């Protein structure tokens, strides 16, 4: 059971009190197949295939909602929501190679990920004491794919190890949301796609001199995220007409990181500085607005930007005593 008490401020002060009984029931099945082959002590390869599917998944809630405007109750109704999740598979293929040629160590990883999700939702609203009633049916499907590759070369330089490498990731997600009724108080149909490519190159160096450890690295990323509002085939030539530049993004950034560990008497000091990025998920970027009840919609925001974080950390240790201090600075935070 769940109770929600929400207050909305505007021209009208609105209070929405809701009591929920939530029910869910799902069955999942999965399978995997893989192999690993060692040629010799310097070369090995392997791959795995995994599939997941939910043959049965149902959910929903029963709720009683009371609505108050400027201190007076204006509406009371029940909402019986039933959701049937579509039985669509998720597939994941991964492969790797690990080897050594001379003094150079080679690590390669690749992945192909395919996912299909969807649900059909029924919302039956019944007004109390002669209030209006209605039944809303909506349908949502999402198809996504991703393929990625990462290569790292490691070899000794002076008294440490130098690593250089690159990564490439390309992904796409297509969303389709339809609702059986249209009106000024109902969301409309949405059909959008987001395609993103990420090309990265990085270098790092780590060494140990007596009791001092130093690790430093630099990563460069070129990210292109294109947003399309379309009902057509993404790969068709006509699809360029549906490109939305205001909701698309391009990034070119460097991400440095430095870590230094050294003793101070009987204590051990570690200092870290790094820059990281957190990008919105596909669901957060979707323009789809899902209808849950006449007062609750759920959706994303295609205008969200990536959040960049600059962080400094200090760790001081002495026997069982540990002291931590962290400083963070966020650029374009998303909460």
Model-derived regions, located:
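Extracellular loop and loop/strand-boundary signature of outer-membrane beta-barrel proteins
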Residues: 14-21, 77-83, 131-139, 183-191, ...
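Periplasmic-side early beta-strands and strand-to-turn transitions of outer-membrane beta-barrels
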Residues: 1-39, 53-70
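Outer-membrane beta-barrel translocator domains and adjoining extracellular loop/strand segments
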Residues: 2-12, 58-74, 118-128, 174-183, ...
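Face-selective signature of the C-terminal outer-membrane beta-barrel domain
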Residues: 28-56, 80-232, 263, 267-268
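Outer-membrane beta-barrel signature, preferentially recognizing the C-terminal barrel domain
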Residues: 84, 190-198, 246-249, 277-331
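Acidic/polar loop patches that form or flank catalytic/metal-binding clefts of enzymes
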Residues: 267-272, 323
């Amino acid at each position: 059971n769940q109770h929600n008490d929400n207050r909305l401020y505007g021209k009208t002060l609105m209070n929405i009190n809701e009591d929920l009984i939530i029910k869910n029931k799902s069955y999942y099945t999965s399978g995997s197949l893989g192999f690993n082959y060692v040629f010799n002590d310097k070369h090995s390869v392997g791959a795995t295939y995994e599939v997941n599917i939910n043959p049965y998944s149902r959910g929903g809630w029963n709720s009683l909602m009371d609505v108050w405007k400027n201190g007076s109750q204006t509406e009371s109704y029940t909402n019986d929501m039933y959701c049937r999740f579509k039985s669509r598979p998720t597939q994941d293929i991964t492969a790797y190679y690990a080897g050594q040629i001379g003094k150079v160590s080679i690590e390669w990883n690749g992945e192909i990920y395919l996912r299909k999700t969807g649900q059909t939702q029924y919302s039956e609203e019944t007004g109390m004491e002669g209030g209006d009633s209605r039944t809303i049916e909506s349908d949502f499907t999402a198809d996504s794919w991703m393929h990625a590759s990462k290569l790292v070369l490691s070899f000794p330089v002076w008294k440490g190890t130098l690593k250089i490498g690159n990564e490439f990731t390309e992904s796409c997600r297509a969303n389709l949301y339809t609702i059986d009724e249209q009106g000024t108080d109902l969301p409309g149909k949405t059909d959008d796609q987001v395609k993103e490519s990420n090309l990265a190159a990085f270098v790092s160096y780590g060494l140990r001199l007596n009791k001092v450890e130093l690790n430093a690295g630099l990563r460069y990323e070129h990210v292109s995220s294109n947003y399309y509002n379309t009902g057509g085939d993404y790969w068709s030539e006509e699809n360029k007409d549906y490109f939305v530049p205001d909701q698309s993004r391009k990034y070119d950034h460097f991400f440095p990181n430095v870590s230094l560990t050294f003793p101070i008497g009987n204590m051990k000091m570690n200092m870290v500085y790094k820059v990281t990025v957190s990008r919105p998920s596909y669901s957060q970027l979707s323009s789809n607005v899902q209808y849950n009840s006449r007062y609750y919609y759920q959706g994303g925001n295609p205008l969200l930007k990536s959040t960049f974080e600059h962080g400094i950390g200090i760790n001081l240790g002495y026997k069982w005593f540990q002291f931590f201090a962290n400083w963070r600075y966020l650029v374009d935070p998303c909460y």
